[in-house]
Swiss-Prot record:
Domain of life: Bacteria
Ranges that cross the membrane: 30-50, 60-80, 105-125
GO MF, any single term: succinate dehydrogenase activity
Gene: frdD
Taxonomic source organism: Vibrio vulnificus (strain YJ016)
Main location, first listed in the record: membrane
Protein name: Fumarate reductase subunit D
GO CC term (a single one): fumarate reductase complex
Assembly and oligomerization: Part of an enzyme complex containing four subunits: a flavoprotein (FrdA), an iron-sulfur protein (FrdB), and two hydrophobic anchor proteins (FrdC and FrdD).
GO biological process terms, semicolon-separated: fumarate metabolic process
């Protein structure tokens, strides 16, 4: 007996899981890590709650050149950018700006460029 439905044996593969994973990682990072970073660097240190000597130039450079520090800085710059550009790409579609593949490539190329620049700048330290 033959089934009544056809199974597509070579389904079209989508690249959306890649973009959605970067979108999700960027959103999570932006929601959980960025507020703490802003609190510490933008409020607590200037108010004197945290000693400014703790963030002296030498200590910051040694942190930024360590593997953990470099990954933290790269993730802080790159992941929210992937999140934002994914939102821009889908927001343009929602606003009826159907840019197709060109818009997709432009949005994700900008996020990739910012990510690459973050890596380059870390290696320049």
């Amino acid at each position: 007996m033959k089934p009544n439905y056809n199974v597509d044996r070579a389904p079209k593969r989508s690249d959306e899981p890649v973009w959605w994973s970067l979108f999700g990682a960027g959103g999570t990072w932006f929601a959980m890590i960025t507020p703490v970073t802003v609190l510490v660097l933008g409020i607590l240190v200037p108010m004197g709650v945290i000693n400014a000597e703790a963030l002296s130039y030498d200590r910051v450079v040694s942190f930024a050149t360590s593997i953990i520090g470099a990954l933290f800085i790269i993730a802080t710059l790159a992941l929210p950018m992937w999140h934002a550009m994914h939102r821009v790409h889908h927001g343009m579609h929602d606003l009826k700006f159907h840019t197709g593949v060109v818009g997709k490539i432009a949005c994700y190329a900008i996020a990739g460029l910012i990510s690459a620049l973050a890596v380059v700048f870390i290696f320049m330290l």
